[in-house]
C-alpha cells in the first residue's frame, strides 16, 4: 500500500483534529506534524490536542501509526556540551507521542560545532541510547542530512555507523530525497542508488521518507527544498519512490514549499499518485 502525505500544521484551536482534517482533504493517508513551532521547544498540554475527536472522526483514514512527529530543529543531540538538554526534551516529546499513539519521531542528528566529527557521532549515539532507555514504543528515525555547515549524518557511512552502534529496533532511518541528493547521491540514477542502499543494507531500516525536490544541483550541500518537478531531481525520479514496492507501507512525507502563501500538497499528491514512473 502506498502511504503518501505531507507536513501539516498542528495549531490552535484544533491541533490533531485540524491536522487530520486537512490531510484527509488533501487525499493523504499519513501526515507529519511538529508538536510546536520547529524553532522552539515550547509545547501545549496534550489535553488540548483534541485527540478523542481525531480518533472518532479520522483514525480509520489516518491511523495513529501514520502520524509522524518531527523533533524541533534546535535540539542538538550530537553536541558534546548541549546534549543533556536535547535528551531531556526528547524524552518529554516521546511521552507526548505516546499519548496520541504516534510511532515515529524524525530527528535531525545535529552538528559537531566546535567538536570533532567523531566526537559528535559518538555523542549522538550516546544520546539516542539514553533516550531509548527512558522511553517506550516510539521509534527514533535519524534523518539523512545534506552536509550543510557542520551537520553530521550526511552520508550512508555515518548513518550505518549509528545503526550498528545503537543496535535497537526502536532506532531507524528517515530518508530525505533532497538531502541525500544535495549530499552527493544521484538518486536520478535510481537503480544505482538502490544498489548503494542495498550495499549498506539500509532498506530494512528506512521507516519514513521525506519526498522533496531540490533547488540546488547534485552535491551542493545546500538543503533547499523545491516543489515536486520544479527542481533538479524531477517528477520521474520522485514518483519512483512512491511506486516502488520496496517502499510500500512506509509513510512518504512531502515537505515542499508553499506557493502564493498556501500549500499545494493536494496537487503534488495527486501528481505523484497518477504518475507511473517509467
Curated annotation (Swiss-Prot):
UniProt keyword Nuclease, yes or no: yes
Enzyme Commission number(s) from the entry: 3.1.21.2
Any GO molecular function: DNA binding
Cystines in this chain: none
Keyword DNA repair in record: yes
Protein residues bound to Zn(2+) 1: 70, 108, 143
Family note: Belongs to the AP endonuclease 2 family.
Top EC class, one word: hydrolase
Residues annotated as binding Zn(2+) 3: 179, 223, 225
BP GO terms, sorted: base-excision repair
Cofactor binding comment, as recorded: Binds 3 Zn(2+) ions.
Function as written in the Swiss-Prot or TrEMBL entry: Endonuclease IV plays a role in DNA repair. It cleaves phosphodiester bonds at apurinic or apyrimidinic (AP) sites, generating a 3'-hydroxyl group and a 5'-terminal sugar phosphate.
Residues that hold Zn(2+) 2 according to the record: 143, 176, 210, 255
Keywords noted in UniProt: DNA damage, DNA repair, Endonuclease, Hydrolase, Metal-binding, Nuclease, Zinc
Record-linked Pfam families: AP_endonuc_2
SMART domains: AP2Ec
Catalytically driven reaction(s): Endonucleolytic cleavage to 5'-phosphooligonucleotide end-products
Gene: nfo
Stated name of the protein: Probable endonuclease 4
InterPro entries the UniProt entry points to: AP_endonuc_2, AP_endonuc_F2_Zn_BS, Xyl_isomerase-like_sf, Xyl_isomerase-like_TIM-brl
Cofactor: Zn(2+)
